[in-house]
Amino acid sequence: MKLSMPRFDQAPVLVVGDVMLDRYWHGGTSRISPEAPVPVVKVEQIEDRPGGAANVALNIAALGAPASLVGVTGDDEAAESLANSLRGAGVRALFQRIAHQPTIVKLRVMSRHQQLLRIDFEEPFATDALALNGQVDELLEGVKVLVLSDYGKGALKNHQELIQAAKAKGIPVLADPKGKDFSIYRGASLITPNLSEFEAIVGGCADEHDLVTKGAALMADLDLGALLVTRGEHGMTLLRPGHPAMHLPARAREVFDVTGAGDTVISTLAASIAAGEELPHAVALANLAAGIVVGKLGTAAISAPELRRAIQRSEGSERGVLTIEQLLLAIDDARAHNESIVFTNGCFDILHAGHVTYLEQARAQGDRLIVAVNDDASVSRLKGPGRPINSVDRRMAVLAGLGAVDWVISFPEATPENLLAQVKPDVLVKGGDYSVDQVVGADIVSAYGGKVKVLGLVENSSTTAIVEKIRNNE
């Protein structure tokens, strides 16, 4: 399945549900309390983040999609903090504030990136807390997807009113369910329970076949358009009536914190579907997004550039022949992992042992090696008639197959100054008997603090000599 980045800027999404504030007290612990056998935390930083349905809306906005949010809060400091955070992120938030009830707050006490304690401040909302008062049609105006973010806190009581109103307008409804009664989501386009939530409804699943069978029965019973079961380290399973089950493996490189991963899944699904992606593609994108967010601390969102880089990796463009756009993203990703970038360039018309040795030496100067290749017209201008022997596509394909080479890109000019100005490598490498100040582009690289290195060439290895031997039938 080939993935591409959706046009999220044209994908308005409405989120309705339980909003809350995730508050973090970060501090250090160096002693045990004399009052009880518990650690003493000296609080050094207090951090507020949108949680629950607010985190879903935040994730949608972080991808670049227009996001609106409807929910219930108290009339207090926590509600103001939520409103300010969401406003700053570009989320249009409509809160029904109830004076006599507190905004739901999840307070986590953290030390050295470890959660020591969670304290919940919440009271169940009244049955009529989220009174839409006939505003449903107005709220759905211009929306391409509706998300019901249900945390079972009482704000979301009118599931069917919302589902039926959206269906009447042809708007897909995605629900992140809670509780032991999934009938309240009847008719939804897609629900996204995790495995424990799913098994609480259908019973334990002995294996994948059992999960698929029970999932199909649940879809039929509730008239669901689709069912996505998130399964932690086992990935996700998408079920659709009349289609085979689609199992996706987990994509996380490192799991640091699973807080809010479900929010990231449904937000990426919603934004992708709103942008016109088919459901299997949207699920694959959501799976990539989940793999990113579990590597972050606490409730977090992923950005469009992060998702774009994950798509690149999934499509195998982490190495090989790249466009300039792909290369710049790959470089950003490498630098985020503290990897240094090495750059070299040449015609590489007939690849020989000297080239291979030189490229291995160049790669040893850093973590990632870019090889920039003169295109065919450029080689012809430099080398004369009859050159190149091999087209630029063939030359780049051979270079990309070498273990020392990470990325290959072509350029049309005689020299790579324009490319160097965009790439800004940490090290510029050239082979030959030049002095450093004679290397083309050395001034560009040196100006921003990069290094320039000249490597010796392997003796008796020359493309020109090989071409002459061939022409002379030697």
Curated annotation (Swiss-Prot):
What keywords would UniProt list here?
A: ATP-binding, Carbohydrate metabolism, Kinase, Multifunctional enzyme, Nucleotide-binding, Nucleotidyltransferase, Transferase
The EC number(s) given in the record are 2.7.1.167, 2.7.7.70
GO CC annotations, alphabetized: cytosol
Q: Where does ATP bind?
A: N194, L195, S196, E197
- Which GO biological process categories is it annotated with? ADP-L-glycero-beta-D-manno-heptose biosynthetic process
Per UniProt, the enzyme's principal EC class comes to transferase
Q: Spell out the InterPro entries in the cross-references.
A: Bifunc_HldE, Carboh/pur_kinase_PfkB_CS, Cyt_trans-like, PfkB_dom, RfaE_dom_I, RfaE_dom_II, Ribokinase-like, Rossmann-like_a/b/a_fold
Where is region (Ribokinase) located?
1-317
Q: In which pathway does it act?
A: Nucleotide-sugar biosynthesis; ADP-L-glycero-beta-D-manno-heptose biosynthesis; ADP-L-glycero-beta-D-manno-heptose from D-glycero-beta-D-manno-heptose 7-phosphate: step 1/4; Nucleotide-sugar biosynthesis; ADP-L-glycero-beta-D-manno-heptose biosynthesis; ADP-L-glycero-beta-D-manno-heptose from D-glycero-beta-D-manno-heptose 7-phosphate: step 3/4
Give the catalysed reaction(s), semicolon-separated.
D-glycero-beta-D-manno-heptose 7-phosphate + ATP = D-glycero-beta-D-manno-heptose 1,7-bisphosphate + ADP + H(+); D-glycero-beta-D-manno-heptose 1-phosphate + ATP + H(+) = ADP-D-glycero-beta-D-manno-heptose + diphosphate
Which HAMAP family does this chain map to?
Answer: HldE
Give the function comment from the record.
Catalyzes the ADP transfer from ATP to D-glycero-beta-D-manno-heptose 1-phosphate, yielding ADP-D-glycero-beta-D-manno-heptose.
Q: Which family does it belong to?
A: In the N-terminal section; belongs to the carbohydrate kinase PfkB family.
Q: What is this protein called?
A: Bifunctional protein HldE
